[in-house]
């Protein structure tokens, strides 16, 4: 096809092309119809303000007025002054639609329509020359103008526009789209027949298949109404021929002698009136169009503008201006002052601006709110489906991220992390449960337990061991020299051979007067050699040793096996050897240990020399003060020493709760020892007696301090 005269850049959309091309000589017609009277147009009228004029692009305000009574009401057309020009005089019943391209020529097009509204859903009527609509058939279009369109094609009209640019119909291949009138402008240059141009132009003006049908009809009414009223202002009839070119100079001779009969678009075939129709007295380029064609365009455009509040006032102002022949001083839409030369250019600019306001972002919303109807079910389903899909996507993404995080944690920390996450990370009870279930102690707990073993306080050891089975003997005030037997110091209900995860500490004190220096028991010293010294006694032996180490424990390396332990203090005082007879003169202070509930092979903790402190310097100071206070006349006699409490010097034992070979009923040689003790207990000047009493006091203090291993004190006189 030839290129458009206006160009696609100036008129970017096909709907505006339809508006501009339908009145193809409007520019010259506006110049030829001067002057206009200025007395009728009330520019300060409220309906001429900008908001009312911009309502032309609002589909909801326009759509419900486009009913058949607006299109078919010939009384309104008579009031507009176009009914007389609707039909030519005496030409017959043939309509101007009956052209060479139309298959059948019926008297009227719109008389065959039976729908209550031209735009009522779900049917959409599009007039096409190839779809045989002039026989009464209806076309169900699904392009972007259809309000019942539900496909993606409705939102994308570019494919139709591309086909129109080539001059082809988007629905038919062998004909041109009636919406595209650019070929009509060029066809007039090549002297095509008037019937072809007139029928295509009129069908396109009456067609509603543009991308925005209400806007195209409403905005084109301004241009067409001016031309129609200018054409209807003369009572004379001027015949013309078909053989003139489309654009004309102002001086064009009209020497034609045939008449045309035109049926009005809104009138039935029986309501045609034969009148004389003449253009203005001077020649103008609109004279080549048929009079009935202009009347039809005028009736449609007037009906469209009357449907809009601003458009109605604009129509009335233009009608008054056309009747008086004066140009307005300012634009009724924007209020801009215009000269006579700028009026028609500004008019087309306003049409272009109104269409651009309505073409873009409101296109989808116009379909949803068309004629105040609810959106199509397919559109509602699409919105609901998209919302549901978004929620599903969010849920799936969250679940997937959680699974990935879980895998990363398992790969990084292993199953131990997953087991530990089941319990509280700060609660020690939960940590203990975790350790019991997994069978291993967490590394941080293992380090803490090792520190506690190395730096444990001896005084608070009894509080930490509630089930140790050792009840400390507290000497009574009445009998300070008597000590309970070791069999009563132990809990007989305790289970032997079971540590229960609790650590025990033992300290054994053995005071010996041994003439044989090679016989020394494995002992743990209570009083260090540097801290205290007794009068007339030799330096004490102090050491920590293990007699038998059988094997290491399975849980920790701090557990060892020990048979017995005691503290040996050799007293070499000469006075004690002279007042005592033989081996029976030895003063022995022994404290047995209640180490666990096992035999002599039981696990016992052995720590460094610095950490195991059973007494302090305060205790030593007290012992020395009591020794000074006790003189020769105030010494106590140790009475009621039972043979059960006696122990041989060479055989220190570890008390146990089990009846067996380690039972503490050693009765050998107890009679001699008892007699020796009784004979020597009356000696008030004996320093060994002072030593025994002082050791008794120190052991009672140790028992009150909470040392769990002190159970028995044996004294030999």
From Swiss-Prot:
Keywords of this entry: Nucleus
Locations listed in the record: Nucleus
Biological process according to GO: negative regulation of DNA-templated transcription; protein ubiquitination; synaptic target recognition
Ranges of compositional bias, category Acidic residues: 452-466
GO molecular function: ubiquitin protein ligase activity
Stretches with biased composition (Basic and acidic residues): 442-451, 513-522
Protein name: Protein Teyrha-meyrha
Annotated gene: tey
């Amino acid at each position: 096809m030839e290129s458009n005269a206006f160009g696609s850049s100036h008129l970017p959309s096909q709907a505006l092309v339809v508006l501009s091309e339908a009145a193809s000589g409007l520019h010259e017609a506006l110049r030829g119809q001067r002057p206009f009277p200025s007395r009728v147009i009330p520019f300060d009228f409220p309906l001429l303000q900008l908001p009312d004029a911009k309502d032309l692009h609002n589909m909801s305000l326009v759509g419900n007025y486009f009913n058949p009574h607006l299109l078919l009401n010939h009384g309104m057309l008579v009031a507009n002054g176009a009914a007389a020009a609707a039909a030519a005089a005496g030409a017959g019943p043939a309509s101007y639609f009956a052209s060479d391209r139309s298959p059948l020529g019926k008297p009227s097009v719109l008389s065959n329509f039976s729908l209550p509204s031209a735009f009522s859903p779900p049917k959409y009527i599009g007039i096409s020359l190839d779809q045989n609509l002039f026989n009464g058939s209806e076309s169900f279009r699904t392009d972007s103008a259809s309000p019942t369109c539900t496909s993606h094609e409705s939102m994308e009209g570019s494919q139709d526009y591309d086909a129109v640019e080539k001059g082809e119909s988007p629905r038919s291949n062998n004909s041109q789209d009636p919406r595209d009138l650019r070929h009509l402008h060029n066809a007039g240059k090549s002297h095509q027949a008037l019937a072809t141009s007139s029928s295509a132009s009129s069908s396109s003006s009456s067609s509603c298949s543009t991308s925005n049908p209400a806007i195209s009809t409403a905005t084109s009414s301004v241009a067409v109404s001016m031309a129609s009223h200018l054409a209807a202002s003369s009572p004379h009839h001027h015949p013309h021929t078909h053989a003139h070119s489309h654009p004309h100079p102002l001086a064009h001779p009209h020497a034609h002698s045939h008449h045309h009969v035109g049926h009005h678009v809104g009138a039935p075939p029986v309501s045609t009136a034969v009148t004389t129709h003449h253009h203005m007295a001077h020649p103008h380029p609109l004279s080549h169009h048929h009079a009935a064609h202009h009347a039809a365009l005028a009736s449609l455009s007037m009906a469209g503008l009357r449907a809009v509040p601003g458009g109605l006032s604009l129509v009335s102002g233009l009608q008054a201006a056309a009747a008086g022949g004066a140009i307005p001083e300012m634009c009724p839409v924007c209020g801009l002052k215009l000269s006579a030369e700028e009026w028609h250019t500004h008019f087309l600019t306003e049409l272009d601006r109104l269409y651009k306001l309505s073409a873009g972002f409101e296109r989808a919303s116009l379909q949803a709110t068309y004629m105040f109807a609810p959106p199509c079910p397919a559109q509602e389903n699409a919105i609901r489906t998209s919302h549901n899909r978004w929620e599903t996507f969010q849920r799936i993404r969250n679940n997937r991220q959680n699974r990935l995080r879980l895998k990363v944690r398992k790969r990084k920390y292993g199953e131990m992390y997953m087991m530990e996450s089941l319990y509280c990370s700060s609660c020690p009870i939960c940590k203990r449960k975790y350790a019991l279930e997994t069978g291993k102690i967490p590394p941080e707990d293992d380090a803490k337990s090792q520190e506690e073993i190395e730096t444990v306080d001896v005084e608070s050891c009894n509080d930490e061991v509630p089930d140790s089975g050792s009840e400390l003997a507290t000497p009574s005030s009445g009998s300070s020299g008597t000590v309970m037997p070791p069999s009563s110091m132990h809990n007989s209900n305790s289970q032997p051979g079971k540590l229960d995860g609790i650590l025990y500490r033992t300290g054994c004190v053995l005071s010996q007067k041994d003439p044989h220096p090679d016989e020394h028991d494995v002992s743990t010293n209570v009083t260090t050699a540097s801290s205290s010294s007794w009068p007339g006694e030799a330096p004490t032996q102090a050491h920590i040793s293990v007699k038998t180490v059988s094997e290491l424990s399975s849980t920790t390396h701090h557990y060892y096996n020990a048979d017995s332990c005691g503290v040996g203090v050799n007293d070499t005082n000469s006075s004690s050897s002279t007042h005592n007879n033989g081996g029976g003169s030895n003063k022995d202070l022994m404290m047995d240990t209640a180490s666990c509930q096992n035999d002599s092979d039981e696990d016992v903790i052995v720590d460094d020399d610095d950490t195991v402190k059973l007494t302090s310097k305060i205790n030593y100071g007290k012992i020395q003060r009591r020794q000074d206070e006790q003189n020769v006349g105030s010494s106590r006699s140790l009475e009621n020493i039972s043979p059960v409490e006696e122990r041989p010097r060479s055989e220190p034992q570890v008390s146990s709760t089990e009846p067996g070979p380690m039972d503490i009923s050693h009765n050998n040689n107890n009679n001699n020892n008892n007699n020796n003790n009784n004979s020597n207990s009356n000696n008030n000047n004996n320093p060994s007696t002072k030593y025994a009493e002082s050791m008794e006091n120190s052991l009672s203090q140790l028992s009150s301090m909470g040392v769990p291993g002190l159970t028995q004190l044996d004294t030999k006189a």
